[in-house]
């Protein structure tokens, strides 16, 4: 009888490993091609700066986020995780990473979409911003070159002040995005988005704060 029970438990564990492997395989079939398209769309948007390219990039990111926002899939992952029966070390690690990825997206899909759209709008503004110094319109690379090589104090000041003007263009959008992200994080049981980001990337907020305090005291 005891042997039968042990054998049954072993089969149950093996089944849970199998269930998770199948979950990962199904997820990869959806995510891998979409991730490739998303990365290419983002690259094209960053290069062209065009409205339509940023819109396409946002759409792919929304599609990707909705995969990880799927409530049924998250319930399956949660069941697998809480079973404690994924015994393979690599699978267990994959389970932790995927669980955190899904958890961070378990919010209202409409709000998720709004955040992605706003984030994309901010990125577009940053991407297309040009600092005007005199009659010159400078790209980020040109600004970086001046700031890292020039010894002309006046020129350095003019370039730096011109570059800072991007702040006023994105300030309101950033404040709005911060508020939306914090509300989303609170709805998932976190204090704010900062805490959620750290914990879901497996970092301890207290330890991070302690580290920065130590750096400040150096």
Spans of features found by a protein language model:
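N-terminal helix-rich structural modules
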Residues: 10-176, 194
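Active-site-proximal, well-structured secondary-structure segments within enzyme catalytic domains
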Residues: 136-145, 149, 157, 175-218
